[in-house]
Amino acid sequence: MPAVQMTGVGGAVPAQVLTNYHLSELVTTSDEWIASRTGIRSRRILAPGQSLTQLAARAATDALSQAGRSPLDVDLLILATSTPDDLFGGAAHLQHEIGAVRAVAFDLTAACSGFVFALATASQFVRTGTYRTVLVVGADALSRYTDWTDRATCVLFGDGAGAALLEAGEVEGILGFELRTDGARAGHLNIHCTAEAVPLAADMAATRARFASITMNGREVYRFAVEAVPDLIEKTLAACGVAPEQVKAYLLHQANQRILDSVASRLHVAPERMASNLADYGNTSSASVPLILQEWVQDGRIRAGDRVVLAGFGAGLSWGVLLARWGRL
């Protein structure tokens, strides 16, 4: 049975920068108010005419280049997204955009947990020998579903894309994972589908659907995150026989700096090992974990063989933790 290694990572964000000062002109808020409560100073937003597929393609190409692979090497492509350009799915469009013509492609939707869920899924395809080279992409454009008059949510979200390449190898790089879902709390974070009646006959109608803006019970989501995430990290590490201090970096979904600080405190992790890029990008949903991984690999803070914890959490409610050793081993 082949081992699984994470051999490349890439990231991409739009050029358009939306700062807290811009938002203070839209709603009653300030840079200090937003930053002190979230850690966010700015976020990147897709401009009109720009597609999520194009953004995801940049991240995917970056990951392949770092791993020394071409799109023709990819056997399977998984796109983790909640905001595809096409409701039928974005993965096929991405496959075409990057020229991965030999790859099977499908979407996986698990909101802000999506990238971790997709990595875990991809690892099983490699481990069973079904596929040898799997490209996992997390990309979202939550700006498309943001109510820019809602101060509670419009300050949080940005757009972005990140990607990682998994390959079969001799030495195991995916050490373990745990995934969870609690549908009883699904109502705490949503983009609801609303429907308008379309008359078809005297006694018959269909519906025309559209998606509303993001709604969130911030207090409940925060409570869930600071309790469930560190607990699952501890369970994952224990199952793998790894102590928290043996992990080089904790790469969590970038939702709120207070959540990151709380998890670090609970795990007794030094602040410098709890990665954060919230100040620059905000909450990019399924893109946040690969984006922060790409940053830390690029600047040398993560090197081949280092243990890293990847953790996603969000709508569903869903949460997942994956322990890996980075790089070609």
From Swiss-Prot:
Molecular functions (GO terms): 3-oxoacyl-[acyl-carrier-protein] synthase activity; beta-ketoacyl-acyl-carrier-protein synthase III activity
Signal sequence annotation: none
One term under GO cellular component: cytoplasm
Record Pfam families: ACP_syn_III (PF08545), ACP_syn_III_C (PF08541)
Catalytic activity: malonyl-[ACP] + acetyl-CoA + H(+) = 3-oxobutanoyl-[ACP] + CO2 + CoA
Record Gene3D superfamilies: 3.40.47.10
Superkingdom of this protein's organism: Bacteria
Pathway connected to this protein: Lipid metabolism; fatty acid biosynthesis
GO biological process: fatty acid biosynthetic process
Active site positions: 112, 253, 283
Coarse class of the protein's main subcellular location: cytoplasm
UniProt EC number: 2.3.1.180
Region of interest: ACP-binding: 254-258
Transferase as UniProt keyword: yes
Subcellular location: Cytoplasm
UniProt KW RNA-binding keyword: no
Keywords: Acyltransferase, Cytoplasm, Fatty acid biosynthesis, Fatty acid metabolism, Lipid biosynthesis, Lipid metabolism, Multifunctional enzyme, Transferase
Summary of subunit composition and partner proteins: Homodimer.
Description of its domains: The last Arg residue of the ACP-binding site is essential for the weak association between ACP/AcpP and FabH.
Free-text function comment from the UniProt entry: Catalyzes the condensation reaction of fatty acid synthesis by the addition to an acyl acceptor of two carbons from malonyl-ACP. Catalyzes the first condensation reaction which initiates fatty acid synthesis and may therefore play a role in governing the total rate of fatty acid production. Possesses both acetoacetyl-ACP synthase and acetyl transacylase activities. Its substrate specificity determines the biosynthesis of branched-chain and/or straight-chain of fatty acids.
Annotated NCBIfam families: fabH, PRK09352.1
PANTHER family: 3-OXOACYL-[ACYL-CARRIER-PROTEIN] SYNTHASE, BETA-KETOACYL-[ACYL-CARRIER-PROTEIN] SYNTHASE III, CHLOROPLASTIC
UniProt family annotation: Belongs to the thiolase-like superfamily. FabH family.
HAMAP family attached to this UniProt entry: FabH (MF_01815)
Name of the protein in question: Beta-ketoacyl-[acyl-carrier-protein] synthase III
Name of the gene this protein is made from: fabH
